[in-house]
């Protein structure tokens, strides 16, 4: 509904001689006695108008020119809020747009002609995906879906961490297990990867090569085989919850020199050095962030010669700018919180518009089974695996539970709750609302000859009871919820919203007879049910969960 009010508020401001680029906030009051919507615009602009907020609010109310039959009353409340009361028929006429636009309801073309890249999952290919990585995967996938509703050309990218010390450890781990297959006694380091999958990869190599690799210290074949097997497994796991990527960027390419051309990492060092932001001491190469007011410089190349995470991350982002992306969204775990401000600062120093880079940090996940928390450790081989979770609770529950809490909050994944077939389970609750409507429509077609294909929503203005108006009002919030999700990079807002829609539909279903109502009201209530189903479907598509027609 923000789109409805905005032009009228802007027109009133223009008439009052007030020009502003401040964002006009339009909200729903918690208490309906304060209206259906309200704005704090008088607070925001009182200083520019040289009036107190109540005085400015009163002036603006006199300048609003809402069409007849839309806003029934405007009033000043408290120290200067402007409250709007809408006509019931206006809610219902507006709800017709849901049926008219169908799956396009909530979509805009604000991102048309712009390229966006969303990087997510990007787990090291050192073992099967853990549940913690799954949360970031679903978060990133939902953000990509949200961007597509706004017309962006979206690339979903996986940053393949195939360089660095962890890959050396992986190769060594497989080689140790391979030597055991060859009959040798090996002291396996505690610091190495100990899961059964390491032994399985080693077994494959032994079957293919017998013991011919045992006499060599060369790790290449062990690294390449482990990478291929593990990454194939990662992709299969992600596909089980509907996550696929369009592009895979290999970290090792940032280390490569091509025909005398410096590597991506080296180019970053050279460019920062040209800006006098590189220091060399203690045997390492440093990003001199003390010049930016920080307490310490940050290492880019360690004394061992290995780069820190910061250097390839900076170089990787340079490639995103070079590839022409207008918006770059990165989804990371909480372990990146300290590092990423340095990456953004480096991009600014190098002359890039760092405001195009958006960061979504998701907090850690623990799983509870039977009241017991499961610990995760890939290296120790007792990781809480995403595959096992999907097998246990299903793809829909896995996805929804990962995003039903704010990304900024620690998530406790209650496996038992995710498996419940009751309203306590948020997945069941949402999908049941959709299935209930599908069942109702089938029954209406059979018993009263309802023709879904002919439904236009034209009869909706006949409805004016409180449950009906509350339901229609909630449906019209859908476009604003999409915008809120994008602004905050927070699809959890969509989960909350759809729960509200389902809750209001269940109340409407209980309090407003449908098939037993008079014909005109029956048709209107069936059409209202269709609008609810459409909004649920559109929301489910963003969240990546199915819309069952029966349960």
Swiss-Prot record:
Reaction(s) catalysed by this chain's protein: tRNA(Arg) + L-arginine + ATP = L-arginyl-tRNA(Arg) + AMP + diphosphate
Enzyme kind, highest EC tier: ligase
MF terms (GO), sorted A to Z: arginine-tRNA ligase activity; ATP binding
Keywords: Aminoacyl-tRNA synthetase, ATP-binding, Cytoplasm, Ligase, Nucleotide-binding, Protein biosynthesis
SUPFAM superfamilies: Anticodon-binding domain of a subclass of class I aminoacyl-tRNA synthetases, Arginyl-tRNA synthetase (ArgRS), N-terminal 'additional' domain, Nucleotidylyl transferase
Keyword ATP-binding annotated: yes
Disulfide links within the chain: none
SMART domains registered for this protein in UniProt: Arg_tRNA_synt_N, DALR_1
Motif annotated as 'HIGH' region, chain positions: 123-133
E.C. no: 6.1.1.19
Record Gene3D superfamilies: Arginyl tRNA synthetase N-terminal domain, HUPs, Isoleucyl-tRNA Synthetase, Domain 1
Any one biological process term the GO annotation gives: arginyl-tRNA aminoacylation
Subcellular location: Cytoplasm
ATP-binding listed as a keyword: yes
Main location group: cytoplasm
Entry GO terms, CC: cytoplasm
Subunit-level organization: Monomer.
Family, similarity comment: Belongs to the class-I aminoacyl-tRNA synthetase family.
PANTHER family assigned to the protein according to its UniProt record, in alphabetical order: ARGININE--TRNA LIGASE, CYTOPLASMIC (PTHR11956:SF5), ARGINYL-TRNA SYNTHETASE (PTHR11956)
Database matches in NCBIfam families: argS (TIGR00456)
Protein name: Arginine--tRNA ligase
């Amino acid at each position: 509904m923000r789109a409805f009010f905005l032009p009228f508020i802007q027109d009133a401001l223009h008439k009052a001689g007030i020009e502003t680029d401040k964002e006009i906030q339009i909200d729903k009051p918690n208490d309906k006695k304060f209206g259906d919507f309200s704005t704090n615009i008088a607070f925001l602009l009182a200083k520019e108008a040289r009036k107190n907020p109540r005085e400015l609010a009163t002036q603006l109310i006199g300048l609003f020119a809402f069409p007849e039959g839309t806003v029934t009353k405007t009033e000043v409340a408290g120290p200067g809020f402007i409250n709007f009361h809408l006509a019931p028929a206006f809610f219902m006429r507006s709800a017709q747009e849901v049926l008219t636009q169908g799956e396009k309801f909530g979509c805009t073309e604000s991102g048309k002609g712009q390229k966006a890249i969303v990087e997510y999952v990007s787990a090291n290919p050192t073992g099967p995906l853990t549940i913690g990585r799954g949360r970031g995967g679903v978060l990133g996938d939902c953000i990509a879906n949200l961007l597509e509703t706004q017309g962006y050309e979206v690339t979903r990218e996986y940053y393949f961490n195939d360089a660095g010390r962890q890959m050396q450890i992986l190769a060594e781990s497989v080689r140790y297990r391979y030597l055991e297959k060859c009959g040798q006694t090996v002291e396996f380091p505690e610091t190495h990867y100990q899961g059964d999958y390491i032994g399985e990869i080693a077994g494959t190599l032994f079957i293919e090569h017998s013991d011919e690799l045992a006499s060599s210290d060369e790790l290449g074949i062990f690294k390449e085989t482990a990478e291929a097997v593990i990454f194939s497994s990662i992709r299969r796991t992600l596909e089980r919850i509907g996550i696929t990527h369009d592009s895979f960027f290999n970290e090792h390419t940032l280390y490569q020199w091509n025909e005398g051309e410096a590597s991506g990492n080296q180019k970053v060092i050279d460019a920062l050095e040209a800006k006098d932001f590189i220091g060399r001491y203690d045997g390492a190469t440093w990003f001199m962030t003390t010049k930016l007011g920080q307490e310490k410089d940050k290492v880019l190349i360690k004394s061992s010669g290995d780069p820190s995470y910061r250097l390839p991350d900076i170089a990787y982002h340079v490639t995103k700018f070079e590839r022409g992306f207008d918006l770059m969204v990165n989804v990371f775990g909480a372990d990146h919180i300290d590092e990423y401000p340095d990456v953004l600062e480096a991009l600014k120093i190098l002359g890039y518009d760092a405001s195009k880079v958006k960061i979504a940090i998701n907090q850690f996940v623990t799983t509870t089974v039977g009241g017991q928390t499961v610990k995760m450790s890939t290296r120790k081989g007792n990781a809480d695996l995403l595959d096992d979770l999907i097998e246990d609770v299903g793809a829909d529950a896995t996805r929804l539970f990962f995003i039903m809490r704010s990304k900024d909050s620690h998530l406790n994944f209650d496996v038992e709750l995710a498996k419940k077939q009751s309203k306590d389970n948020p997945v069941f609750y949402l999908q049941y609302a959709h299935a209930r409507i599908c069942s109702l429509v089938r029954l209406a077609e059979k018993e009263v000859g309802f023709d879904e294909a002919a439904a236009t929503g034209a009869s909706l203005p006949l409805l004016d009871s409180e449950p009906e108006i509350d339901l229609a009002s909630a449906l019209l919030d859908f476009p604003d919820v999409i915008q809120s999700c994008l602004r905050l990079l927070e699809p959890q807002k969509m989960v909350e919203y759809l729960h509200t829609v389902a809750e209001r539909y269940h109340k409407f279903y209980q309090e407003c007879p449908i098939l037993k109502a008079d014909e005109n009201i029956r048709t209107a209530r069936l059409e209202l049910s269709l609008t609810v189903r459409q909004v649920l479907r559109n929301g489910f598509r963003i969240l990546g969960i199915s819309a069952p027609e029966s349960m």
